[in-house]
Amino acid sequence: MYFVHPQIKLKELKKVNLSERLPFYFPGKQIVFTDMGRSAFKIIAENLNLQGSDLLMPAYICDVFTPVLQQYNIRPVFLDIDLKTFHIKKEEIRKKITKKTKAIFICHTYGLPFDVDALRKELQGFQKISIIEDCAHAFGAGVGNKGEAAFFSLYKQFPTVRGGILVCPKDWQVSLPKTSFNLRDFVSFLNYFPAFAFLFKRYGSEIAPKVVRREKMPDPASLNKRSLCLFSRSLGYFEKSLEKRKELALFFQQELKKLGFEVQEDKGNVFCLLSALVPKDLQDKRDEIVKELRKHRIFCIRIWKDPIVLDKERFPNTFEAAKRVINFPLQNHHTKKDVNKMMAALSYILKKK
């Protein structure tokens, strides 16, 4: 069985000292663990005084930020994306800056680092515009240090159930209330084990309605101790196996290209989500392909398949990506044999289309 979300290998859970390890990733920065990544974004919005301002951001992004933007009266100014990177089009940035623009929100989409240095040059000559890095998919990609602030979403890459990291200047005063690991968190934790994950995928909607993972408090809060412990015990194996993951992802991409898929650029990519666009002649059958793969116990996803923008003419690439993207399973413990099994199933399905 193959799943996109992180899976637990018990023998690889070895605790590391986070207070010693994390400064290596974020030198000279303050590191704050939050209940969720969006909690960290709220703290950033407050400390950068974004209330009532314009925020440049990708049109191809999760709708989870919408309530935060509304809460702080921030007007999103959307930019279309490049289909090879899934990043915002740099050529659109200058055209979209307004007198009320205080920040630009960039996303290291699917694990591919966005060139923040090039963005700095692009912003020269404008009033002070802060750069906010959305690193939800990109822990280990060397990102999070070049903007005014950054945030990570731990459970996208680690079996932590929930959790975010705020990376910000040391002079920010951040004090957060504590949270606890509850029953719903425990049920979510079981999803990191393949047998339970399969049962949840197969019967979950019959047992209980799907509930979006939300913050435990209306205001930003800290990460519970059990999730923090899971992160500390997963980080060592993540670091040790990251290069193997990258190598396997490149092999996976080459196999996908043989079937006509268009793959994301790979330079610096940590492949949190190995994502590809189905061939254009099959784009109307993308959802059928995903459903057929489930019969082979290959559980792909299609994140952001429903664009948060409505104007297809202004954001053509965003709509195309939403219609064609498939996010394939890739775990750090997978091998080429696993990839070959998935590709054999995919090839069989495509031949019937």
Residue ranges and their predicted role:
Residues 171-225:
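Active-site C-terminal subdomain of aminotransferase-like
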Residues 84-175, 331:
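Active-site phosphate-binding strand-loop segment of PLP-dependent enzymes
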Residues 174, 281-289, 334-340:
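Short, conserved charged micro-motifs
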Residues 188-191, 266-269, 286-325, 348-351:
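Conserved PLP cofactor-binding pocket of PLP-dependent enzymes
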Residues 44-99, 292-293:
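Conserved PLP-anchoring active-site segment centered on the Schiff-base-forming lysine
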Residues 1-51, 72, 237-240, 347-353:
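Conserved PLP-binding active-site segment in aminotransferase class I/II-type PLP enzymes
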Residues 6-8, 221-242, 246-253, 263-277:
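Conserved glycine-rich beta-strand-loop-beta hairpin in the small C-terminal domain of fold type I
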